[in-house]
A protein has these predicted regions:
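Intrinsic low-complexity, repeat-rich intrinsically disordered segments enriched
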Residues: 1-18
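Surface-exposed molecular-recognition determinants
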Residues: 14-189
């Protein structure tokens, strides 16, 4: 149904798929959480989140919380985090019925983790929310650099609009690093 005007070299009427930036923040201070309220909608089914250099307190995890606009209601999840480190060690963690998704495993305060994940169907009231992702971090327990593979599925099918990043204990962020967190929606047509 689209047309191409060769004289003006403009393209009109074609679908514009791809990643569309929804929100991006930088942080270089200690905070209890980084909130993206009302970032999920019926516009997209799939979201891509990038977290660059976000420090945590020593031996803590960065957690994702999926909830309504004021986080008074949040989803519970079944989570798997598999981890490989440079010492050729493998470990994994499993959690069920928890109101968060661990994005790294006992990260170090001096080396900020970087994380990327894809979130499927957070706004759907029919399909469960699912998460797949990777994280790169320095693991305090064991003192090694690690790669984490993440997988998670919500226990229910409630429409959610917001994402919160917080720490398993203590604060996120540091004046020593400027972290950036960006959320993109995947336009499918």
């Amino acid at each position: 149904n689209g047309t191409i005007d060769a004289t003006g070299a403009t393209i009109t009427g074609f679908p514009e798929g791809g990643l569309k930036l929804i929100s991006s923040v930088t942080n270089n201070s200690s905070v209890t959480s980084i909130d993206f309220t009302n970032c999920f909608s019926a516009t997209y089914r799939v979201y891509y989140v990038v977290i660059a250099s976000l420090p945590v307190a020593s031996a803590q995890e960065i957690r994702a919380v999926i909830g309504n606009s004021d986080f008074s209601s949040t989803d519970t999840f079944q989570n798997v985090l598999a981890q490989w480190d440079v010492g050729e060690n493998f470990a994994y963690r499993v959690s069920t019925g928890v109101a968060y998704i661990d994005l790294n495993n006992t990260g170090g305060a001096g080396e900020p983790p970087s994380i990327q994940f894809t979130l499927f169907n957070p706004f759907s009231s029919v399909e469960r929310t699912q998460l797949l992702g990777q994280s790169s971090y320095y693991r305090t327990s064991g003192g090694t650099y690690s790669l984490g593979q993440l997988a998670s599925m919500s226990d229910g099918t409630v429409s959610r609009t917001s994402l919160r990043l917080n720490c398993s204990s203590g604060n996120l962020g540091s004046s020593s690093y400027t972290a950036r967190v960006s959320i993109y929606g995947l336009a499918e047509s």
